[in-house]
A protein has these predicted regions:
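Conserved catalytic cores of very large enzyme subunits
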Residues: 2-204, 238-245, 249-557, 562-669
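Secondary-structure-rich domain cores
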Residues: 216-223, 561
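Low-complexity, highly charged intrinsically disordered N-terminal segments
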Residues: 201, 205-208, 216
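Structured binding/interaction patches within domain cores
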Residues: 220-221, 226, 243-246
């Protein structure tokens, strides 16, 4: 394997990160369970959640690897995957599956099977959020979920998909704690019926502040302890500087470029240790956040580009050390990856509308180019004001063919965010995160609820709502394919089925939203999300400035080609009958070579600049958008759509019969 990294230190750290086998770490689960046993019913739920993080950070195993400059791991070591039984309590069989499966496996210590069986399952099996969710869902929701009509992100993970703002570089957690106390002092218990609940939430935030500061204090002490034993003078100085950095952050705001990177990483650990949010916390506009520290340190003579790049590459290793929480069942099938989808935005424009490219932007491109890691994901925002030099350098990195950076249009992002009700300033500070989703960084809870299998719903439409794969009546009984005399009649039935399943999905999502708001607040994430402190409300309870829920439509190309095949061949050209097509689908096209050739090769297709197909695509998209976007959610915001599959098209295809576009049964959409 080719070694990568700017110097020997980074090469060694990168190699360790890439070569280390991901493994299950139960330390967090055991600590959290003890906290619940001690404090459940004594503390309010927000305070209990703050205490969980505090107890974990006060006792967790510390790790400073050889040569590390940025410190902190979510678990006991690189590639450790803590479990979150309060969300999803895995069975012992699940643990064996994680350990034994060929792909995306997590090794489990022999003694941890017994801990899971004797401690975790008895305490968490019935009280986990996953169990609460499944008890609360309707039979219609459960059937649709189990048969692959849609997935549910919150079934094994927490709401997340949020991004950092400049705020964490302007304040330390002592400052946040003072802000929280000021908000408590302003509560009006005479006139505000929510004052008591707000106080509980704010007290939980104070405990979360204590948690992250304890972690910093412990790392400062640990670095000094290692420095005392270190015989290499260069490394001793580095360890003492790490200790000095941890004396400052996270309790106080960072003063240097190195401290700013360490501050971000402590915050990242706080968010992803509190719960396992889908997707993980992202740095957002890291180049713009770090550049003031870079410029000051260069001016003061304590930083050069070589050191600045080295520190970035150490941060890249930290991202790659954190595998996504282990998944099982449908959740594994819908997103089978180690990556946790942290995503960096580089370039774009500043909050006042000027060119946002700076010296750190180029360093980040160099870092991407040298590291080529699975995590973090990286993109560049390209605006009308982006220098050609930056665009050219980004293209040089991208042309090497490893998928990064992705390219996004800044003006389109801003327009999309403003269309969704964001202010111009908040839109300019925003960007993309996770896969391709846009959001107002630091100001928005934009939570993904799951994938929606549009081609599967068309399959049900052709069969009177009946699912041949599972042998169940899932949809509305609106007629069989041969009953629809015109394409318009068929499409109207298809729309009714879409709305029926959207109603089921969104009703379930509203209930799930309330379950998380009541039972799984996230006081730490709430601290660093704008407006939660001033409102006294949790991120999971509507505290953010903007609260958006997304439902991802999957299979837009497949459904376009399916509808095109039916409209073009059955209704327009009459090259075969609907009955002949349905028989071909039932036979998985075996013995139907003529029909298969026609639908695959002689029919207008999506993505070919063919208005016949494109007009169908637009009609499907607009209907799906009209039925989702604008629906109110339970947090005072609205639902919106995305169109993306990640890896869910593989799972969705597996639960389907053959499709009219020539896709064979069980093949990806």
């Amino acid at each position: 394997m080719e070694e990568r990294g700017m110097n020997e230190r980074v090469k060694k750290l990168r190699k360790l990160s890439v070569d280390t086998q991901p493994h299950i770490d139960l330390e967090r689960a055991k600590s959290m369970t003890k906290t619940y046993e001690k404090y459940e019913g004594v503390l309010s739920i927000p305070e209990l959640r703050g205490q969980v993080l505090k107890d974990y950070f006060a006792t967790k195993t510390l790790y400073i690897g050889e040569g590390e400059l940025i410190v902190g791991e979510k678990g006991d070591s690189p590639q450790a995957a803590p479990t979150f039984p309060e969300l999803c309590c895995h069975t012992v069989e699940d643990m064996h599956v994680m350990n034994d499966r060929d792909l995306i496996n997590f090794k489990v210590k022999e003694e941890d099977y017994k801990v899971q069986e004797d401690v975790m399952i008895p305490y968490w099996d019935k009280r986990s959020t996953r169990s609460r969710i499944l008890r609360a869902m309707t039979p219609e929701w459960k059937k649709a979920y189990e048969c692959g009509i849609f997935t549910e992100f919150m079934e094994q993970r927490g709401p997340g998909h949020t991004v950092g703002s400049v705020k964490i570089y302007e304040k330390g957690f002592l400052d946040y704690k003072a802000d929280i106390q000021a908000s408590i002092d302003k509560l009006d218990f005479m006139n505000d019926p929510e004052a008591f609940d707000k106080k509980s939430e704010l007290e939980g935030m104070k405990l979360a502040c204590d948690a992250i500061m304890i972690l910093g204090e412990r790392y400062a002490a640990y670095a000094r302890e290692l420095a005392e034993k270190e015989t290499d003078e260069t490394r001793k100085k580095e360890l003492l500087q790490i200790a000095a950095n941890c004396d400052v952050v996270p309790a106080h705001k960072p003063q240097t470029y190195w401290q700013a990177i360490q501050m971000y990483w402590f915050v990242h650990l706080g968010v992803t240790s509190e719960l396992n949010p889908w997707d993980a916390y992202s740095p957002g506009r890291l180049d713009q956040h770090l550049n003031p520290f870079y410029e000051k340190d260069v001016e003061d003579g304590i930083l050069d580009d070589e050191k600045a790049l080295e520190l970035l590459e150490c941060l890249w290793v930290k991202f790659n050390n954190q595998p996504a929480p282990p998944k099982v069942g449908i959740t594994l099938k819908e997103s089978s990856t180690y990556t946790d989808f942290a995503n960096l935005n580089t370039g774009g424009i500043t909050p006042n509308g000027e060119n946002g490219v700076n010296n750190v932007s180029y360093l980040i491109l160099d870092c991407m180019d040298e590291m080529k890691l699975l995590q973090p994901s990286s993109n560049v925002q390209i605006s009308r004001k982006t220098p050609q030099k930056f665009l050219k350098r980004a293209c040089e990195v991208s042309r090497k063919g490893w998928g990064q950076p992705a390219f996004y249009n800044t003006e389109a992002i801003i327009q999309e965010l403003m269309n969704a009700g964001k202010s111009l300033e908040d839109a300019r500070k925003g960007g993309t995160s996770g896969c391709v989703e846009t959001g107002a960084f630091g100001n928005e809870a934009y939570i993904l609820t799951g994938y929606f299998n549009i081609p599967k719903i068309f399959e049900l439409t052709l069969n009177n709502g009946y699912d041949k794969m599972s042998g169940q009546q899932l949809g509305l009984e609106l007629g069989y394919a041969t009953d629809f005399e015109t394409y318009e009649d068929l499409f109207e039935a298809f729309k009714k089925q879409i709305k029926y399943f959207l109603d089921i999905k969104i009703q379930g999502s509203n209930v799930i939203e309330k379950i998380f708001a009541e039972y799984m607040p996230v006081p730490f994430l709430s601290i660093i999300t704008n407006d939660c402190i001033s409102r006294g409300k949790d991120y999971n309870g509507g505290g953010a400035r903007y609260n958006t829920k997304y439902l991802q439509g999957v299979g837009i190309g497949t459904i376009t080609d399916c509808l095109s095949a039916v409209k073009y061949n059955v209704y327009d050209k009459k090259t075969f009958t609907m009955a002949e097509l349905m028989q071909a689908l039932d036979d998985n096209f075996e013995g139907h070579d003529r029909i298969l050739n026609l639908v695959r090769n002689k029919t207008p297709k999506y993505g070919n600049d063919d208005d016949y197909a494109d007009d169908i695509m637009k009609e499907v998209f607009e209907y799906y958008r009209s039925q989702v976007t604008g629906r109110p959610n339970m947090l005072g915001g609205m639902y919106r759509i995305n169109m993306l599959p990640t890896t869910c098209h593989v799972y969705f295809g597996d639960v389907m019969m053959a499709s009219p576009n020539g896709r064979l049964a069980h093949k990806p959409e």
